[in-house]
Structure formats: C-alpha cells, structure tokens
Regions:
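Short, Lys/Arg-enriched N-terminal segment that forms or immediately precedes the first helix
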Residues: 29-43
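Short amphipathic alpha-helical surface patches that mediate protein-protein
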Residues: 39, 73-74, 116-117
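Secondary-structure capping and boundary motifs in well-ordered enzyme cores
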Residues: 43-49, 88
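Active-site- or DNA-interface-adjacent structural scaffold in DNA-acting proteins
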Residues: 86-130
C-alpha cells in the first residue's frame, strides 16, 4: 500500500504574494554574510535564510514572536515562503528573539532594505510621498 503525501506547493495558489517575493528576492545571497558567522559544529539548526524569512513575515504581518510561531504552524503560505514542508516542525517563539539578537536589531534594516528595493523594482510596493 502506498501512502500519498501531498506537497505544500499544491495548497498555495500560484498568484500568492509570497510566491512573488520568493521570485524577486535572492534570500540565500542576501543572508550569505550571516551564514558565514554560523558555526558548522554542533547540532544543525534552521537555515539562516529560513530564519530571516520568518523575521520578514513577522515584520510584514505585524506579529509577536508567539503569534509568528502559531502563524507558521497554521498558515500554509507562510510555511511555503519560509521553506518548511507540510510535516516539518517550525520554530518556537524563543528562536526568533535569539535570531534577532544574533543579527543585531540595528542591523536588521541592512537586510530589510535590499528586500524593499527588490520589491519596488518588481512592482510589488511603491513609495508614496505626502
């Protein structure tokens, strides 16, 4: 007997905004400097680009750490965006504060600004001066 395990990709519509962001932003390249600071020793954790995408969702969706934990458990588009599978465990709330400390709150803008520029170039956002 074969067990069919569906792919997360099947449950998120093709025109979802998170998919467009993934097309426009090279998160691996963006987080390369952070990756170099991670040790290759010890138990492996979540990939750096995955953690950064979680923080980006937290910012754009205006979520607390605990709300982000639940969002990633329940929201299929959020799981897809961050790179989690249907059956993968997502981080708990404490992971996000540790990651922010590791990056440094003042340096988050250094990573968010290139994302903003890519989204502007891709036509997803625009600046309105009033």
């Amino acid at each position: 007997m074969k067990v069919f395990i569906p792919k997360l990709d099947q449950f998120v519509r093709e025109d979802h905004p998170y998919r467009k962001i993934l097309e426009l932003v090279d998160f691996k390249e963006l987080t390369q400097a952070l990756q170099e600071e991670y040790s290759s020793r010890g138990r492996g954790g979540y990939p750096v680009d995955t953690g950064f995408k979680c923080l980006l969702l937290q910012y754009t969706e205006d979520l607390s750490d605990r709300e982000l934990e639940r969002f990633l458990q329940e929201n299929l588009a959020g799981k897809l965006f961050c790179g989690f599978g249907l059956d993968e465990t997502t981080p708990d709330f404490s992971y996000f504060s540790v990651l922010r400390k590791r990056i440094g709150t003042s340096h988050l803008a250094d990573f968010f600004n290139p994302v903003r520029e890519s989204l502007k170039e891709g036509g997803m956002i625009r600046e309105i001066i009033t």
